[in-house]
């Protein structure tokens, strides 16, 4: 059975209260594609690795898509009304401004594909840690990986330059 059209602006207004930290992400449809609305602000330090492309449409406000491009970190600003198609296998870290709202479309993963979360040293851009996993639920599969990385001082310490990657405030008491 066909799903009726969704009035995107009305959906955002009805669910705006859910588009805030710490999650800020709601899946609105999933059938071949994962269609999400994401609200800001956020302060992600991880990079997401997806074997498929991702499509970004900035509805309100601005965001910066940090990417790892051939070993170099760079920023791609995406403003309200702009779209951007991220090619497959490009590590990226969406940085959303307060009050911003974006639509993100990803294709569902193929059975053999895995998602990844990566962290890079903010001083020298050396890869600190990478976790690959089969993605089953985009809203619940990431937090355990975040916890594992941020709770480990060893994983957050750069083997190249010795810099310690900062952990979000909620992990501040954890230095094991």
From Swiss-Prot:
It is an enzyme of class 1 (oxidoreductase). Binds 2 Fe(2+) ions per subunit. It catalyses: 3-hydroxyanthranilate + O2 = (2Z,4Z)-2-amino-3-carboxymuconate 6-semialdehyde. Disulfide bonds: none annotated. Pfam families: 3-HAO (PF06052). Its cofactor is Fe(2+). Fe cation 2 binds at residues 121, 124, 158, 161. Fe cation 1 binds at residues 48, 54, 92. Pathway: Cofactor biosynthesis; NAD(+) biosynthesis; quinolinate from L-kynurenine: step 3/3. GO terms for molecular function: 3-hydroxyanthranilate 3,4-dioxygenase activity; ferrous iron binding. Gene3D superfamilies: Jelly Rolls. GO terms for biological process: anthranilate metabolic process; L-tryptophan catabolic process; NAD biosynthetic process; quinolinate biosynthetic process. O2 binds at residue 44. Keywords: Dioxygenase, Iron, Metal-binding, Oxidoreductase, Pyridine nucleotide biosynthesis. Substrate binds at residues 54, 96, 106. Its EC number is 1.13.11.6. It comes from the Bacteria. InterPro entries: 3hydroanth_dOase, RmlC-like_jellyroll, RmlC_Cupin_sf. The keyword Metal-binding applies. CDD domains: cupin_HAO. Catalyzes the oxidative ring opening of 3-hydroxyanthranilate to 2-amino-3-carboxymuconate semialdehyde, which spontaneously cyclizes to quinolinate. Homodimer. Belongs to the 3-HAO family. This is 3-hydroxyanthranilate 3,4-dioxygenase. The gene is nbaC.
């Amino acid at each position: 059975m066909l799903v009726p059209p969704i009035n995107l602006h009305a959906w955002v207004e009805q669910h705006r209260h859910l588009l805030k930290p710490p999650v800020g992400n709601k899946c609105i449809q999933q059938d071949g594609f994962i269609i999400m609305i994401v609200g800001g602000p956020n302060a992600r330090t991880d990079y997401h690795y997806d074997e498929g492309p991702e499509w970004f449409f900035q509805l309100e406000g601005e965001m910066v898509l940090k990417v790892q491009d051939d070993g170099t970190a760079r920023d791609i600003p995406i403003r309200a009304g702009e779209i951007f198609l991220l090619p497959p296998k490009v590590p990226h870290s969406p940085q959303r401004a307060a009050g911003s709202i974006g639509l993100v479309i990803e294709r569902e993963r193929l059975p053999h594909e895995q998602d990844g979360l990566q962290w890079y040293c903010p001083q020298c851009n050396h890869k600190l840690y990478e976790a690959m996993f089969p993605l089953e639920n985009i809203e619940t599969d990431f937090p355990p990986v975040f916890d594992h990385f941020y709770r480990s001082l060893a994983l957050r310490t750069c083997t190249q330059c010795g810099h310690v990657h900062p952990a979000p405030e909620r992990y501040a008491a954890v230095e094991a």
